[in-house]
Protein backbone atom coordinates (compact mmCIF):
# COMPACT_ATOMS: atom_id res chain seq x y z
CA UNK A 1 0.00 0.00 0.00
CA UNK A 2 1.11 3.54 -0.77
CA UNK A 3 1.78 5.84 2.16
CA UNK A 4 0.50 9.39 1.64
CA UNK A 5 1.73 12.14 3.96
CA UNK A 6 -0.27 15.37 4.26
CA UNK A 7 -0.09 18.40 6.50
CA UNK A 8 -2.17 18.40 9.66
CA UNK A 9 -4.85 20.91 8.67
CA UNK A 10 -8.60 21.37 8.63
CA UNK A 11 -8.99 18.54 6.11
CA UNK A 12 -6.97 15.94 8.06
CA UNK A 13 -7.47 16.84 11.71
CA UNK A 14 -10.58 14.69 12.23
CA UNK A 15 -8.86 11.58 10.83
CA UNK A 16 -5.84 12.32 13.00
CA UNK A 17 -8.03 12.73 16.08
CA UNK A 18 -9.74 9.41 15.36
CA UNK A 19 -6.34 7.73 15.12
CA UNK A 20 -5.21 9.10 18.48
CA UNK A 21 -8.46 7.88 20.04
CA UNK A 22 -7.96 4.38 18.56
CA UNK A 23 -4.41 4.16 19.88
CA UNK A 24 -5.43 5.54 23.27
CA UNK A 25 -8.28 3.04 23.64
CA UNK A 26 -5.89 0.20 22.82
CA UNK A 27 -3.38 1.48 25.37
CA UNK A 28 -6.03 1.82 28.10
CA UNK A 29 -6.76 -1.88 27.81
CA UNK A 30 -3.24 -2.41 29.17
CA UNK A 31 -2.95 0.72 31.32
CA UNK A 32 -6.35 1.79 32.68
CA UNK A 33 -4.63 4.60 34.61
CA UNK A 34 -4.46 6.64 31.39
CA UNK A 35 -6.95 9.54 31.16
CA UNK A 36 -10.24 8.30 29.70
CA UNK A 37 -10.98 11.53 27.84
CA UNK A 38 -8.59 10.71 25.00
CA UNK A 39 -10.73 7.72 23.99
CA UNK A 40 -12.98 10.29 22.30
CA UNK A 41 -12.04 11.29 18.74
CA UNK A 42 -13.49 14.79 19.05
CA UNK A 43 -11.53 15.43 22.25
CA UNK A 44 -8.36 14.28 20.49
CA UNK A 45 -9.07 16.55 17.51
CA UNK A 46 -9.61 19.44 19.93
CA UNK A 47 -6.25 18.70 21.56
CA UNK A 48 -4.62 18.73 18.12
CA UNK A 49 -6.23 22.08 17.38
CA UNK A 50 -4.81 23.49 20.63
CA UNK A 51 -1.38 22.37 19.48
CA UNK A 52 -1.91 24.06 16.12
CA UNK A 53 -2.96 27.23 17.92
CA UNK A 54 0.31 27.17 19.90
CA UNK A 55 2.63 27.07 16.88
CA UNK A 56 2.86 23.31 16.42
CA UNK A 57 2.87 21.97 12.88
CA UNK A 58 2.09 18.38 12.04
CA UNK A 59 1.87 15.65 9.45
CA UNK A 60 -0.67 12.87 8.96
CA UNK A 61 0.38 9.65 7.22
CA UNK A 62 -2.42 7.64 5.60
CA UNK A 63 -2.85 4.38 3.72
CA UNK A 64 -5.94 4.02 1.53
CA UNK A 65 -7.44 7.12 3.14
CA UNK A 66 -7.04 5.86 6.72
CA UNK A 67 -4.66 7.68 9.05
CA UNK A 68 -1.87 5.42 10.32
CA UNK A 69 0.39 8.02 11.97
CA UNK A 70 0.21 11.59 13.21
CA UNK A 71 3.18 13.57 14.46
CA UNK A 72 3.44 17.21 15.53
CA UNK A 73 6.34 19.46 16.48
CA UNK A 74 7.18 22.90 17.81
CA UNK A 75 10.62 24.41 18.26
CA UNK A 76 11.33 25.65 21.76
CA UNK A 77 14.36 27.06 23.55
CA UNK A 78 15.59 26.35 27.06
CA UNK A 79 18.55 27.75 28.94
CA UNK A 80 21.66 25.57 28.95
CA UNK A 81 20.41 23.50 26.01
CA UNK A 82 19.31 25.90 23.31
CA UNK A 83 16.78 25.15 20.60
CA UNK A 84 15.06 21.78 20.55
CA UNK A 85 12.04 20.18 18.91
CA UNK A 86 9.16 19.27 21.22
CA UNK A 87 6.87 16.44 20.06
CA UNK A 88 4.00 16.05 22.52
CA UNK A 89 2.02 12.90 23.29
CA UNK A 90 -1.34 14.48 22.42
CA UNK A 91 0.05 15.14 18.94
CA UNK A 92 1.62 11.74 18.30
CA UNK A 93 0.03 8.36 17.55
CA UNK A 94 0.44 5.25 15.41
CA UNK A 95 -2.23 2.88 14.12
CA UNK A 96 -2.51 0.20 16.85
CA UNK A 97 -3.05 -2.64 14.36
CA UNK A 98 0.41 -2.14 12.81
CA UNK A 99 2.71 -4.94 13.94
CA UNK A 100 5.82 -2.87 13.18
CA UNK A 101 5.26 0.88 12.76
CA UNK A 102 8.94 1.63 12.15
CA UNK A 103 8.55 2.29 8.43
CA UNK A 104 5.54 4.55 8.83
CA UNK A 105 7.23 6.55 11.59
CA UNK A 106 10.47 6.77 9.62
CA UNK A 107 8.67 8.37 6.70
CA UNK A 108 6.63 10.78 8.83
CA UNK A 109 9.50 11.80 11.12
CA UNK A 110 11.81 12.21 8.16
CA UNK A 111 9.45 14.62 6.44
CA UNK A 112 8.76 16.51 9.67
CA UNK A 113 12.36 16.84 10.83
CA UNK A 114 14.16 17.53 7.53
CA UNK A 115 13.37 21.27 7.33
CA UNK A 116 14.17 21.70 11.03
CA UNK A 117 17.53 19.98 10.66
CA UNK A 118 18.30 22.36 7.81
CA UNK A 119 17.67 25.20 10.28
CA UNK A 120 20.07 23.68 12.82
CA UNK A 121 17.57 22.01 15.16
CA UNK A 122 19.32 18.77 16.16
CA UNK A 123 17.66 17.80 19.47
CA UNK A 124 14.26 16.02 19.33
CA UNK A 125 12.28 15.21 22.48
CA UNK A 126 9.18 13.08 21.92
CA UNK A 127 6.62 11.98 24.51
CA UNK A 128 4.59 8.87 23.73
CA UNK A 129 2.12 6.50 25.29
CA UNK A 130 3.58 3.29 26.73
CA UNK A 131 3.07 0.68 24.01
CA UNK A 132 5.91 -1.77 23.37
CA UNK A 133 5.71 -1.72 19.57
CA UNK A 134 5.89 2.09 19.58
CA UNK A 135 8.85 1.99 21.97
CA UNK A 136 10.68 -0.46 19.69
CA UNK A 137 9.93 1.57 16.56
CA UNK A 138 11.25 4.76 18.14
CA UNK A 139 14.35 2.90 19.30
CA UNK A 140 14.84 1.73 15.73
CA UNK A 141 14.78 5.40 14.69
CA UNK A 142 17.52 6.32 17.16
CA UNK A 143 15.47 7.65 20.08
CA UNK A 144 16.62 6.77 23.60
CA UNK A 145 14.50 6.74 26.73
CA UNK A 146 14.97 9.79 28.93
CA UNK A 147 11.94 10.13 31.19
CA UNK A 148 8.88 8.26 32.42
CA UNK A 149 5.38 9.34 33.44
CA UNK A 150 3.63 7.40 36.19
CA UNK A 151 0.08 7.46 37.58
CA UNK A 152 -1.71 5.80 40.48
CA UNK A 153 -5.09 6.13 42.23
CA UNK A 154 -5.35 8.64 45.05
CA UNK A 155 -6.08 6.28 47.93
CA UNK A 156 -5.44 7.39 51.51
CA UNK A 157 -2.32 5.93 53.13
CA UNK A 158 -1.08 5.62 56.66
CA UNK A 159 2.52 6.38 57.53
CA UNK A 160 4.20 5.17 60.70
CA UNK A 161 7.45 7.03 60.06
CA UNK A 162 9.07 9.33 62.60
CA UNK A 163 9.14 11.94 59.85
CA UNK A 164 6.68 14.83 60.32
CA UNK A 165 5.07 16.50 57.29
CA UNK A 166 3.48 19.94 57.12
CA UNK A 167 2.13 22.20 54.39
CA UNK A 168 4.58 25.02 53.79
CA UNK A 169 3.46 28.60 54.22
CA UNK A 170 4.71 31.78 52.61
CA UNK A 171 7.31 32.06 55.37
CA UNK A 172 8.81 28.72 54.27
CA UNK A 173 9.58 29.64 50.66
CA UNK A 174 13.31 30.07 51.32
CA UNK A 175 13.39 26.54 52.73
CA UNK A 176 11.44 25.30 49.71
CA UNK A 177 13.96 26.97 47.41
CA UNK A 178 16.93 25.51 49.28
CA UNK A 179 15.52 21.99 48.99
CA UNK A 180 14.50 22.45 45.35
CA UNK A 181 18.10 23.42 44.56
CA UNK A 182 19.26 20.07 45.99
CA UNK A 183 17.16 18.26 43.39
CA UNK A 184 18.34 20.47 40.53
CA UNK A 185 22.01 19.98 41.38
CA UNK A 186 21.60 16.22 41.86
CA UNK A 187 20.66 15.93 38.19
CA UNK A 188 24.16 16.95 37.14
CA UNK A 189 25.66 13.95 38.95
CA UNK A 190 26.47 10.59 37.38
CA UNK A 191 24.88 8.92 35.51
CA UNK A 192 22.45 11.72 34.50
CA UNK A 193 25.16 14.31 33.65
CA UNK A 194 22.66 17.14 33.11
CA UNK A 195 24.08 20.68 32.81
CA UNK A 196 24.84 22.08 36.25
CA UNK A 197 22.17 24.49 37.46
CA UNK A 198 22.87 26.95 40.26
CA UNK A 199 20.19 29.67 40.17
CA UNK A 200 20.07 32.22 43.00
CA UNK A 201 17.88 31.07 45.88
CA UNK A 202 15.86 34.27 45.55
CA UNK A 203 14.96 33.34 41.97
CA UNK A 204 13.94 29.83 43.02
CA UNK A 205 11.86 31.20 45.88
CA UNK A 206 10.09 33.54 43.45
CA UNK A 207 9.44 30.64 41.08
CA UNK A 208 7.88 28.56 43.85
CA UNK A 209 5.90 31.56 45.08
CA UNK A 210 4.40 31.68 41.60
CA UNK A 211 3.54 27.98 41.78
CA UNK A 212 1.93 28.52 45.18
CA UNK A 213 -0.07 31.49 43.90
CA UNK A 214 -1.40 29.22 41.13
CA UNK A 215 -2.62 26.57 43.57
CA UNK A 216 0.45 24.41 44.16
CA UNK A 217 0.99 22.92 47.62
CA UNK A 218 4.47 22.43 49.08
CA UNK A 219 4.91 19.65 51.62
CA UNK A 220 7.92 19.87 53.93
CA UNK A 221 9.30 16.90 55.85
CA UNK A 222 10.93 17.41 59.23
CA UNK A 223 13.25 14.91 60.89
CA UNK A 224 14.76 15.49 64.32
CA UNK A 225 13.71 19.12 64.23
CA UNK A 226 15.22 19.86 60.81
CA UNK A 227 13.52 20.44 57.44
CA UNK A 228 15.02 17.70 55.25
CA UNK A 229 12.54 17.00 52.44
CA UNK A 230 10.25 18.66 49.90
CA UNK A 231 7.41 17.48 47.69
CA UNK A 232 5.50 19.87 45.45
CA UNK A 233 1.91 19.13 44.43
CA UNK A 234 0.82 20.92 41.27
CA UNK A 235 -2.54 20.82 39.47
CA UNK A 236 -1.35 21.38 35.90
CA UNK A 237 -0.40 18.27 33.95
CA UNK A 238 2.85 18.36 31.94
CA UNK A 239 1.38 15.79 29.54
CA UNK A 240 -2.45 15.74 29.60
CA UNK A 241 -2.70 12.55 27.54
CA UNK A 242 -0.60 10.69 30.12
CA UNK A 243 -1.19 12.49 33.44
CA UNK A 244 -4.82 13.53 34.07
CA UNK A 245 -5.14 17.31 33.85
CA UNK A 246 -6.68 19.02 36.86
CA UNK A 247 -5.50 16.15 39.08
CA UNK A 248 -2.49 16.34 41.41
CA UNK A 249 0.89 16.11 39.73
CA UNK A 250 4.08 15.76 41.76
CA UNK A 251 6.61 18.41 40.79
CA UNK A 252 9.96 19.33 42.41
CA UNK A 253 10.84 16.81 45.10
CA UNK A 254 14.02 16.42 47.14
CA UNK A 255 15.55 14.92 50.26
CA UNK A 256 18.79 16.18 51.79
CA UNK A 257 21.59 13.65 51.16
CA UNK A 258 22.25 12.96 54.85
CA UNK A 259 18.55 12.19 55.43
CA UNK A 260 18.13 9.68 52.59
CA UNK A 261 17.23 6.12 53.49
CA UNK A 262 15.26 7.17 56.58
CA UNK A 263 11.76 7.18 55.13
CA UNK A 264 11.57 10.87 54.24
CA UNK A 265 10.60 10.39 50.59
CA UNK A 266 8.04 7.66 51.22
CA UNK A 267 6.44 9.68 54.02
CA UNK A 268 6.14 12.67 51.70
CA UNK A 269 4.55 10.55 48.96
CA UNK A 270 2.12 8.99 51.44
CA UNK A 271 1.18 12.49 52.61
CA UNK A 272 0.72 13.72 49.03
CA UNK A 273 -1.51 10.81 48.06
CA UNK A 274 -3.53 11.18 51.27
CA UNK A 275 -3.88 14.93 50.59
CA UNK A 276 -5.16 14.17 47.09
CA UNK A 277 -7.68 11.66 48.44
CA UNK A 278 -8.86 14.08 51.15
CA UNK A 279 -9.50 16.72 48.48
CA UNK A 280 -11.60 14.30 46.39
CA UNK A 281 -9.10 13.77 43.60
CA UNK A 282 -9.02 10.42 41.82
CA UNK A 283 -5.46 10.25 40.51
CA UNK A 284 -1.96 11.47 41.23
CA UNK A 285 0.91 11.47 38.75
CA UNK A 286 4.63 12.10 38.49
CA UNK A 287 7.40 12.18 35.93
CA UNK A 288 11.03 11.22 36.51
CA UNK A 289 14.29 10.69 34.66
CA UNK A 290 14.90 7.00 34.00
CA UNK A 291 18.69 7.43 34.32
CA UNK A 292 18.33 8.80 37.86
CA UNK A 293 19.38 5.94 40.18
CA UNK A 294 17.40 7.42 43.07
CA UNK A 295 14.22 8.45 41.26
CA UNK A 296 13.39 5.46 39.07
CA UNK A 297 13.29 2.73 41.76
CA UNK A 298 11.77 5.12 44.28
CA UNK A 299 8.73 6.11 42.19
CA UNK A 300 8.14 2.57 40.93
CA UNK A 301 8.29 1.19 44.48
CA UNK A 302 5.92 3.96 45.57
CA UNK A 303 3.26 2.44 43.32
CA UNK A 304 3.36 4.64 40.22
CA UNK A 305 2.55 2.73 37.02
CA UNK A 306 4.44 3.97 33.93
CA UNK A 307 1.93 5.10 31.31
CA UNK A 308 4.27 6.90 28.92
CA UNK A 309 7.83 7.88 28.20
CA UNK A 310 9.89 10.78 26.96
CA UNK A 311 12.52 9.80 24.41
CA UNK A 312 15.37 11.86 23.01
CA UNK A 313 17.24 11.85 19.74
CA UNK A 314 20.29 14.08 19.45
CA UNK A 315 21.65 14.27 15.92
CA UNK A 316 25.40 14.38 15.43
CA UNK A 317 25.68 14.60 11.69
CA UNK A 318 29.46 14.47 11.73
CA UNK A 319 29.43 11.02 13.34
CA UNK A 320 27.06 9.29 10.92
CA UNK A 321 28.34 5.88 9.86
CA UNK A 322 31.46 6.09 12.06
CA UNK A 323 30.46 3.49 14.66
CA UNK A 324 30.52 -0.28 14.65
Specify the residue positions occupied by each region the protein language model found.
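Flexible, substrate/cofactor-facing loop regions flanked by secondary structure
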Residues: 163-246
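Conserved donor-binding loop and adjoining core beta-sheet/short helix segment
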Residues: 23-24, 28-107, 223, 228-251
Amino acid sequence: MTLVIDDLDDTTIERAGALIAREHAAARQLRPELPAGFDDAQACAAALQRLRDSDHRGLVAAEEGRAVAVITVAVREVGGIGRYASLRAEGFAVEPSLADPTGVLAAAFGDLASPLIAEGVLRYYLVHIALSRVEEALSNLGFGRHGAYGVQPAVARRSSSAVAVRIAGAEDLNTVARLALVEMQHRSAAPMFAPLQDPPLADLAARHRGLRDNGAVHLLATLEGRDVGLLTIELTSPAPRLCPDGQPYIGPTATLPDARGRGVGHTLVDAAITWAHAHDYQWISVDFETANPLSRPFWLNAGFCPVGYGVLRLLDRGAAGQFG
